[in-house]
């Protein structure tokens, strides 16, 4: 008979002490993370692979939804009361913070996937109490179901909040499909909230980051690290907003426009706030930041610790932000929570209380607000808006639209009746097709003409890759459509081998001109299409040389963008510092990733899987699409074979570092010591990393020659069509 234990009568479930299995990254933290290529693969999608959000959105009664949202704005709930009887300020902040994580360096972040619902964003200090905003929306999301995604609903609610307070918005586009798991993204090196290890030197912010501290969307409203210096704050603001693709005028308009509404909350000390949603108890059901100060809500709410209301009419559009900014001199004070903020000197108490109509407060501002007055450039813009409120309203409307739609990609992806007709340069405009497209007979004829020019496989493939591989699945920018590879800045990028690119484009433009001139009707071939078609011809020629007859798919319909439709400054962010597919590394620019990390990062932006990335690298190497002296592990260059994998995995080769050239290696015959190959970290990672080696072994097998060619062609076609949203 078993003896009773001391735990008899206790709950058998372990609380808080269940052992956690260690992941491979725990054991080897520097291990290359290939798993990011397989996140949001669809297996976690409860709606299934057949679900078409665009079709569901078309069934949405947008007017009815907006009517319900308007009603919600003033339907104050006891569990989270509305400031001033209106949730507008809360919902503007929710939408702003959903979109505001966008960063132009890699196009990641933003509102496009509804990531604010998931960790870590749902628990960032700067997103405190936005969990309540989303819970207020749940009955409406529940009512309209799959016809409106969370990602779209968060932004639409921000628009309706503005409209309900008398502001005329620029428009709204739907089309943001939800994802169902957190995005694994580099938000910074810090291990603590509000840490700022991302800086070096004279406050140089590490790339690709945009925010100043871990857990902030933008800047610290109290000033850099709490230093209440408006000019220092202006420096942070300018850098941070530039990294999310905003210029000075847009920055001023956004800050002032957003701070026309609502208030900040700092009724009590920060230690009275409970854990964030991800750290909360199970019975809290995903609600965080529970406050033990007074009632914890309404007048007793604590969010950022600041207690600021900017306007005399915080639920109506006005010019009070600028009027107050310039009307008073300001003195530093502290909120009830101890946060540093500014109070108007010699002013009347003109600011309403959020919960007591009989009370009035002195005007208050944040350090980051005063930056708009004391920075000379911002001050000039701010005074102009003060004196021209109509221009301010238009600037804010446009900047808000840009903020909330920046990561949606080209206009063809926009859905709904409120899409503005005006084309905006940041949308990377591509004209509509206005002519008949080439048919199969034309395609065959054009391929023959391309191959008859004497252009090599390497030249054709390199040019097509340079055109298409700028695509970013993050913000849907780049890609072959538009043929912007022929325009500044892309035509001059070092990675694109400008001299060779100019030569190839000149030949292709001549073919295009002759073909179009020979047509009796309006049929045309765009240069954008011809670049991709020429690349396909090169791949087919290389495959045939290796004994594999393949037809690379080609669908015409790309069109050429003009220089006037291209924001060269904005496109500069797409220039590759490293392109592992081409074995390219720009030694003149700061690198913030190892070459192999940059390869996986680029593959993820191209929406490639691990096997697709592997097949493309192996094929591009033997086709000499990149640095000609490295990674070309074949005696048959410009022939599409699996030689890269066969020779990389050959145990007769010993790899040794090249003296004085970090990241470069020489492959020597293991017996004789004779040099055979040279390669980079990107090449050797396919033999070193266990998962990538497993992929490489599949393609290095004796029976894989045909499979490799077919897989390469499929992956190649995926990249060439990555920006063809008209085909989806």
Curated annotation (Swiss-Prot):
Cofactor annotation remark: Binds 1 heme b (iron(II)-protoporphyrin IX) group per dimer.
Active site, per annotation: 97
Protein name per UniProt: Catalase-peroxidase
Recorded catalytic activity of this chain's protein: H2O2 + AH2 = A + 2 H2O; 2 H2O2 = O2 + 2 H2O
PROSITE patterns: PEROXIDASE_1 (PS00435), PEROXIDASE_2 (PS00436), PEROXIDASE_4 (PS50873)
Lineage start: Bacteria, Pseudomonadati, Pseudomonadota, Alphaproteobacteria, Hyphomicrobiales
Subunit comment: Homodimer or homotetramer.
Family as reported in the entry's similarity comment: Belongs to the peroxidase family. Peroxidase/catalase subfamily.
SUPFAM superfamilies: Heme-dependent peroxidases
GO cellular-component term (any): cytosol
Binding-site positions, heme b: 259
Modification after translation (UniProt): Formation of the three residue Trp-Tyr-Met cross-link is important for the catalase, but not the peroxidase activity of the enzyme.
Function: Bifunctional enzyme with both catalase and broad-spectrum peroxidase activity.
Entry GO MF terms: catalase activity; heme binding; metal ion binding
Crosslink site: Tryptophyl-tyrosyl-methioninium (Trp-Tyr) (with M-244): 96-218
């Amino acid at each position: 008979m078993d003896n009773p234990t001391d735990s008899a009568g206790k709950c058998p479930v372990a609380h808080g002490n269940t052992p956690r299995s260690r992941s491979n990254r725990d054991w080897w933290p520097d291990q290359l993370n290939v798993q990011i290529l397989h996140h949001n693969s669809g297996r976690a999608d409860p709606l299934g692979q057949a679900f078409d959000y665009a079709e569901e959105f078309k069934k949405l009664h947008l007017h009815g939804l907006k009517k319900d949202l308007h009603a919600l704005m003033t339907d104050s709930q006891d569990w989270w009361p509305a400031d001033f009887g209106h949730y507008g300020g809360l919902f503007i902040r929710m939408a702003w913070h959903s979109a505001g994580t966008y960063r132009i360096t890699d196009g990641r972040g933003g509102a496009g996937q509804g990531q604010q619902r998931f960790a870590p964003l749902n628990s960032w200090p700067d997103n405190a109490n936005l969990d309540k905003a989303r819970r207020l929306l749940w009955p409406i999301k529940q009512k309209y179901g799959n016809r409106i995604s969370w990602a779209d609903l968060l932004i639409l609610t921000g628009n309706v909040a503005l409209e309900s307070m008398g502001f005329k918005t620029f428009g709204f586009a739907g089309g943001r499909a939800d994802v169902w798991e957190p995005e694994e993204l580099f938000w910074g090196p810090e291990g603590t909230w509000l840490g700022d290890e991302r800086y070096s030197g004279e406050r140089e912010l590490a790339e690709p980051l945009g925010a100043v501290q871990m857990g902030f969307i933008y800047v610290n409203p109290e000033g850099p690290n709490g230093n209440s210096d408006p000019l220092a704050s202006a420096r942070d603001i300018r850098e941070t907003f530039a990294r999310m693709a905003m210029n000075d005028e847009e920055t001023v308009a956004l800050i002032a426009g957003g701070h026309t509404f609502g208030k900040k909350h700092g009724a009590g000390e920060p230690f009275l706030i409970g854990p964030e949603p991800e750290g909360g108890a199970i019975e809290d059901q995903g609600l965080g930041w529970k406050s033990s100060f007074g009632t914890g809500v309404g007048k007793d709410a604590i969010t950022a610790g600041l207690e600021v209301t900017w306007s005399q009419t915080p639920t109506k559009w006005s010019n009070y932000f600028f009027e107050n900014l310039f009307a008073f001199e300001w003195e530093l004070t502290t909120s009830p929570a101890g946060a540093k903020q500014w109070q108007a000197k010699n002013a009347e108490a003109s600011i309403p209380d959020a919960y007591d109509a009989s009370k009035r407060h002195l005007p208050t501002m944040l350090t980051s607000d005063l930056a708009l007055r004391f920075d000379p450039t911002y001050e000039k813009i701010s005074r102009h808006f003060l004196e021209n409120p109509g221009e301010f309203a238009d600037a804010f409307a446009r900047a808000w639209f840009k903020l909330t739609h920046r990561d949606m990609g080209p206009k063809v992806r926009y859905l709904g009746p409120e899409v503005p007709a005006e084309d905006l340069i940041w949308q990377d405009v591509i004209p509509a097709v206005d002519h008949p497209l080439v048919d199969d007979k034309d395609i065959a004829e054009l391929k023959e003409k391309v191959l008859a020019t004497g252009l090599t496989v390497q030249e054709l493939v390199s040019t097509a890759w340079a055109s298409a591989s700028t695509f970013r699945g993050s913000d849907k920018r780049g890609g072959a459509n538009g043929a912007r590879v022929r325009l500044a800045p892309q035509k001059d990028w070092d990675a694109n081998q400008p001299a060779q690119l100019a030569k190839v484009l000149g030949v292709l433009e001549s073919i295009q001109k002759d073909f179009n001139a020979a047509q009796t009707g309006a049929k045309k071939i765009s240069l954008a299409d011809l670049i991709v078609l020429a690349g396909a011809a090169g791949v087919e020629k290389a495959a045939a040389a290796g004994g594999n007859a393949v037809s690379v798919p080609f669908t015409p319909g790309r069109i050429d963008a003009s220089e006037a439709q291209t924001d060269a400054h904005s496109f500069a962010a797409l220039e590759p510092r490293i392109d592992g597919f081409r074995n390219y590394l720009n030694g003149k620019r700061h690198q913030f990733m190892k070459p192999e990390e940059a390869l996986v990062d680029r593959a993820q932006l191209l929406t490639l899987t691990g096997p697709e990335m592997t097949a493309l690298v192996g094929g591009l190497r033997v086709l000499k699409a990149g640095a000609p002296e490295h990674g070309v592990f074949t005696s048959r260059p410009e022939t599409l074979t699996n030689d890269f994998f066969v020779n990389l995995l050959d145990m007769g080769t010993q790899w040794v570092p090249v003296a004085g050239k970090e990241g470069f290696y020489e492959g020597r015959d293991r017996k004789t010591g004779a040099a055979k190959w040279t390669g980079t970290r990107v090449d050797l990672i396919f033999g070193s990393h266990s998962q990538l080696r497993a992929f490489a072994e599949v393609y290095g097998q004796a029976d894989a020659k045909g499979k490799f060619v077919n897989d390469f062609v499929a992956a190649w076609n995926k990249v060439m069509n990555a920006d063809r949203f008209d085909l989806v």
